[in-house]
Design a protein with these regions (language model features):
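Membrane-embedded alpha-helical bundles that constitute the cytochrome b-like, heme-associated redox core
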Residues: 1-122
């Protein structure tokens, strides 16, 4: 497959930066620091685009096996859940505590799932 070890390390470092800026945002409290919040979102968008390009390239060159496809779907669903809960937390309304708890857990599950998926696709 076409995913290099450096590609996996790069994506996982981006995920670490996303989680790190997320901690930075949460420790700052509301209203969120616009600069850090924007950085958090931009790193996330970059990671999603790079992951999508890596997945498409792998699929076009050698195809995705069943495990790779299952991993992509699982990671995608976890990533969507992470983004939805993050979006819910960023609005001015008070959200149920389960939303915060999910947003604290989902990024780690997303990182784990994505790392395993990239390793499978390698």
């Amino acid at each position: 497959m076409n995913i290099t070890t450096w590609g996996i390390v790069g994506i996982l470092l981006m995920f670490a930066a996303i989680i790190g800026t997320g901690f930075w945002i949460s420790n700052g409290g509301k209203p969120y620091n616009t600069g850090i919040f924007t950085l958090h979102k931009l790193i996330t968008i970059a990671a999603v685009v790079i992951l999508a390009l890596m997945t498409v390239k792998t699929h076009r060159t050698s195809g995705l096996n069943t495990a790779g496809l299952a991993g992509v779907i699982t990671s995608g669903c976890l990533l969507i859940g992470t983004m939805v809960t993050g979006g819910m937390l960023s609005v001015d309304k008070v959200m149920p505590s389960i939303v915060l708890r999910m947003h604290q857990i989902l990024p780690f599950l997303t990182t784990l799932s994505t790392g395993i998926t990239l390793f499978i696709m390698k």
